């Protein structure tokens, strides 16, 4: 992957069409990624319709690229297809449980990342929307997802109309552990996060938000305890609704 060291998220796109032929080739190539038991426990819902993008937008906090991108792809953990196959072949599927969701979610995310790598090699720009798991029920309703199908990732896809700066990354020393996991000392934390904390844009974030540290930007503004707990509860309810967890009545 020659472009991996220069990849960045793209949030602005040109009007140039992303052809169905190209998308289908990328989907076929991405399907060669790793998958549990060769079951391919994922589905991709392609959205080009302005009307459906409008309906999806609130689930992604109305981020403008959802409506501006030529293509929006919602990738789902999918045990519905495999379950239907089993039922039609006199087999007893036992996939309405949390482990099966985790297996399907892993398959779906592997497929998603492989698709991203392939698409970026073709020159396409993408943005991975983590908001998919924040309000999944809205996406489920909009896309008419049946039981045992759960949205786990969304991509906005198009030809880039911007070239944003590369974002920083932690050094490998911060996340690679040899033989066993090693706890982080205060000195190591200081070392690993020093470069990130020193970036002018991050120092400005801290200043304009009247915070003491960059970490407080994450805990107090971007990913708060209140939001995490509320959206966790919503995600669990969606898993129940989709049949991956027992309901309170069961």
Regions found by a protein language model. Name each.
Residues 1-250:
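Acidic, surface-exposed loops and disordered segments
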């Amino acid at each position: 992957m020659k472009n991996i060291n220069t990849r960045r998220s793209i949030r602005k796109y040109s009007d140039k069409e992303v052809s169905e032929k190209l998308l289908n080739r990328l989907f076929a190539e991405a399907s060669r990624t790793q998958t549990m038991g060769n079951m391919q426990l994922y589905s991709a819902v392609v959205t080009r319709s302005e009307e459906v993008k409008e309906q999806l937008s609130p689930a992604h906090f109305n981020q403008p690229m959802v409506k501006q991108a030529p293509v929006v792809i919602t990738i789902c953990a999918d045990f519905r297809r495999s379950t239907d196959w089993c039922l039609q072949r006199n087999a007893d599927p036992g996939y309405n449980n949390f482990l099966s969701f985790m297996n399907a979610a892993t398959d779906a995310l592997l497929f998603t990342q492989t698709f991203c790598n392939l698409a970026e090699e073709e020159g396409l720009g993408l943005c991975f929307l983590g908001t998919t798991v924040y309000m999944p029920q809205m996406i489920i309703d909009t896309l008419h997802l049946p039981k045992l199908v759960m949205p786990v990732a969304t991509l906005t896809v198009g030809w880039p109309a911007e070239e944003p700066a590369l974002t920083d990354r932690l050094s490998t020393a911060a996340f690679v552990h040899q033989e066993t996991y090693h706890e982080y000392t205060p000195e190591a934390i200081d070392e690993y996060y020093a470069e990130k904390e020193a970036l002018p844009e991050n120092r400005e974030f801290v200043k304009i938000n009247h915070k003491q540290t960059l970490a407080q930007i994450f805990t107090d503004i971007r990913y708060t305890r209140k939001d995490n707990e509320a959206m966790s509860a919503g995600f669990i309810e969606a898993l129940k609704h989709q049949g991956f967890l027992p309901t309170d009545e069961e």
